[in-house]
Amino acid sequence: LGAGVNSTAGVPVCTTINQCLLSKKEVILSQSKKQSMVKEGDFVYDSPEWVLHNGIGYVFPAGGNLFLSKKIQTGSWYSINHTESKNEQQQEVFTLGFNHGCNPRNATYAYIVVPGIHSARKMNNYRKSPVEILANTDSMQIVRHTKLGIWQMVFYKEGTFRNGELSVSVDKACALMIKDGHSGNAELHIADPGQTQSCIKVELLIPEISSERKTVLCDFRNTGIY
């Protein structure tokens, strides 16, 4: 997930999803539920459903303007490390990413990487995946896996997320993972990526488990972990 993509530089802004050697020549793309083989060259697509290359699928649940290239590229190791050779090398390269345009304001993107898939049929089936994106803003990003009952949340500042199944409030930026089993218990894991060495208060309400709001004070002041 990505959100809050901003720029005033007046030049095109992009997010690269992957760039790798074209180890497999076959690149398949699905757009408007029609699959096609991608030819050699540079291409732009408006909201394709998915792309498949070398056993790895890329699913785009929120659409977007994407660029894809499949071509021979030339360069030298010297361009990034002056102790290396200046000899030019050529390789076939696969590149995939999002175009945000010039001067984007609060642009977002979302994609799911699906390894171990080798056919268009399986990619079409994966579009019915249990992964739900419930929030993708510059203040919070929330994803849920419905089959596993796992919620993953990133709060970039104090905030509250709520829907019909749970409510979560935090008083500081943090990353959370919640597993809401149906046994009457929920597992909460929290991280402080900012390493602020402070206390973070989490308020959690899961009506299916309890009608009472649970408050947990997570103390990172000494160990940095909880």
Q: Could you tell me what each predicted segment is?
A:
Residues L1-Y226:
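Terminal accessory/anchoring regions of large secretory-pathway or extracellular enzymes
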